[in-house]
Amino acid sequence: MKIVEVKSKNGTNFMILDGNNEPIVDAVRYLKYLDSVKKSLNTKKTYAYALKNFFVYLESKKICYKEVSFDNFVDFIRWMKTPFEYENVLSYHRKEKSISPKTINLTMTVVSNFYDYLYRSKKLDVNFYDFMHMESKYSKKYKSFMHH
């Protein structure tokens, strides 16, 4: 899984390639959509890397991105906090990766926006975006399920 920078006369964009060096078509279309709504180069790059991390997680779990569940999103957050729990090989030289809650929230925002794009473009029947951003009935203040 890797990110490829693509330059054209219209500017720079990014592609996410799977393990077979094939583009993940819906992710590429989403990144192109970000270009059409005039997102900055740094924003597009940040979104590309966040989506890549999500696709790495899905690949490690052998889950198709169109078949995710709420539990997969929760597990993805756990995976971002402790990615080495999912490896079968231990290393003495490994450094634990420290990801801040802010980075986790940014990544989940990118992922939820990607799923909103898929829903609005009729590639998914389930609206994960609304589900992930539902207001709690116990609080007047908004807190998403990603709140930590």
Describe each region flagged by the PLM.
Residues 27-42, 52-145:
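N-terminal core-binding DNA-recognition domain of tyrosine recombinases/integrases
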Residues 1-41, 45-56:
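Basic/aromatic DNA-contact patch characteristic of tyrosine site-specific recombinases
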